[in-house]
């Protein structure tokens, strides 16, 4: 298939890179995800795609949300600035006139990380903790996509039935407790509210209040992993996303796991491809699909 242009559409940023036949990323760049609606998202995609449309053979897209029938539907529209539905496939085809393959970002990252593991595992899961919480599942060596693209939306499993209302409309989802957005929201009652990134900086400096907020997030992830271990007999979990890859977060998740009986624990490790799992996974999936 030659070279492809991979895009990773997230709640905070849109990343892009050319992916060679050998899997090397070239010219990686990223821009902030626009918050103004469909027109702004289309313009952002054109900015990233247009310079490459005569240099690549296909477009591969990993995107937050539900990817089905060529459309992007946000389970939690707040993660995309309120955008609930977008004709992603038609938009990209109109810009590039190139073959295009779409996949949810968690599913794409899971596919890339599964390849990086080699042939050692049949059942694994990728978890991204970032603006939201998402994931992708490999079961019996196959990526679960689902009939409607919903497979792997683990951030919308239940964490606290009495918790805050999630942007999806359900109360107490894992995303509403553990995401970077939730971490930032936890500080709204502080004398000086701060971002999730600042909470991590404060925790690194020994701030107990900040550490407590991060521990709450890590505990919610550990409990969700326990549920997924029992449902899917997972052998390993790969952790990614800006929160998931933050210094010390993995260790907090592992510490929270240790409070559970052994049968509920599953080995967890950081993403091999770091922040590029979605880009590479989308390209790998596209090559296998076209």
Curated annotation (Swiss-Prot):
<keyword id="KW-0479">Metal-binding</keyword>
<dbReference type="Pfam" id="PF00480">
    <property type="entry name" value="ROK"/>
</dbReference>
<dbReference type="InterPro" id="IPR043129">
    <property type="entry name" value="ATPase_NBD"/>
</dbReference>
<feature type="binding site">
    <location>
        <position position="173"/>
    </location>
    <ligand>
        <name>Zn(2+)</name>
    </ligand>
</feature>
<keyword id="KW-0418">Kinase</keyword>
<dbReference type="InterPro" id="IPR049874">
    <property type="entry name" value="ROK_cs"/>
</dbReference>
<keyword id="KW-0862">Zinc</keyword>
<dbReference type="GO" id="GO:0005524">
    <property type="term" value="F:ATP binding"/>
</dbReference>
<dbReference type="GO" id="GO:0009384">
    <property type="term" value="F:N-acylmannosamine kinase activity"/>
</dbReference>
<comment type="function">
    <text>Catalyzes the phosphorylation of N-acetylmannosamine (ManNAc) to ManNAc-6-P.</text>
</comment>
<protein>
    <recommendedName>
        <fullName>N-acetylmannosamine kinase</fullName>
        <ecNumber>2.7.1.60</ecNumber>
    </recommendedName>
</protein>
<feature type="binding site">
    <location>
        <begin position="132"/>
        <end position="139"/>
    </location>
    <ligand>
        <name>ATP</name>
    </ligand>
</feature>
<dbReference type="InterPro" id="IPR000600">
    <property type="entry name" value="ROK"/>
</dbReference>
<feature type="binding site">
    <location>
        <position position="156"/>
    </location>
    <ligand>
        <name>Zn(2+)</name>
    </ligand>
</feature>
<keyword id="KW-0547">Nucleotide-binding</keyword>
<feature type="binding site">
    <location>
        <begin position="6"/>
        <end position="13"/>
    </location>
    <ligand>
        <name>ATP</name>
    </ligand>
</feature>
<dbReference type="GO" id="GO:0019262">
    <property type="term" value="P:N-acetylneuraminate catabolic process"/>
</dbReference>
<feature type="binding site">
    <location>
        <position position="166"/>
    </location>
    <ligand>
        <name>Zn(2+)</name>
    </ligand>
</feature>
<keyword id="KW-0119">Carbohydrate metabolism</keyword>
<keyword id="KW-0808">Transferase</keyword>
<dbReference type="InterPro" id="IPR023945">
    <property type="entry name" value="ManNAc_kinase_bac"/>
</dbReference>
<comment type="subunit">
    <text>Homodimer.</text>
</comment>
<dbReference type="GO" id="GO:0008270">
    <property type="term" value="F:zinc ion binding"/>
</dbReference>
<keyword id="KW-0067">ATP-binding</keyword>
<comment type="pathway">
    <text>Amino-sugar metabolism; N-acetylneuraminate degradation; D-fructose 6-phosphate from N-acetylneuraminate: step 2/5.</text>
</comment>
<comment type="similarity">
    <text>Belongs to the ROK (NagC/XylR) family. NanK subfamily.</text>
</comment>
<feature type="binding site">
    <location>
        <position position="168"/>
    </location>
    <ligand>
        <name>Zn(2+)</name>
    </ligand>
</feature>
């Amino acid at each position: 298939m030659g070279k492809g242009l991979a895009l990773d559409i997230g709640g905070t940023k849109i990343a892009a890179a050319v992916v060679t036949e050998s899997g090397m990323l070239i010219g990686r760049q990223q821009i902030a995800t626009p918050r103004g609606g469909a027109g702004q998202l289309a313009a952002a995609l054109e900015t990233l795609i247009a310079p490459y449309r005569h240099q690549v053979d296909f477009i591969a897209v990993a995107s937050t949300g539900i990817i089905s029938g060529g459309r992007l539907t946000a389970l939690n529209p707040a993660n995309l600035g309120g955008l609930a539905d977008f004709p992603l496939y038609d938009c990209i085809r109109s810009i590039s006139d190139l073959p295009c393959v779409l996949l949810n970002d968690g599913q794409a990252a899971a596919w890339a990380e599964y390849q990086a593991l080699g042939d050692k595992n049949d059942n694994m899961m990728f978890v991204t903790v970032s603006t939201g919480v998402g994931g992708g599942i490999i079961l019996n060596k196959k990526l679960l996509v689902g009939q409607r693209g919903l497979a792997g939306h683990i951030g919308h499993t239940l964490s606290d039935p009495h918790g805050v209302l999630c942007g999806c409309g359900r109360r107490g989802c894992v995303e509403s407790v553990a995401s970077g957005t939730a971490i930032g929201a936890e500080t709204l009652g502080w004398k000086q509210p701060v971002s999730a990134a600042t909470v991590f900086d404060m925790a690194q400096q020994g701030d107990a209040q900040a550490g407590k907020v991060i521990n709450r997030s890590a505990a919610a992830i550990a409990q969700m992993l326990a549920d997924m271990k029992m449902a899917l007999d997972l052998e390993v979990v790969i952790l990614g996303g800006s929160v998931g890859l933050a210094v010390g977060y993995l260790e907090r998740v592992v510490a929270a796991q240790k409070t559970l009986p052994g049968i509920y624990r599953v080995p967890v490790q950081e993403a091999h491809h770091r922040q590029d799992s979605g880009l590479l996974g989308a390209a790998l999936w596209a090559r296998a699909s076209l």
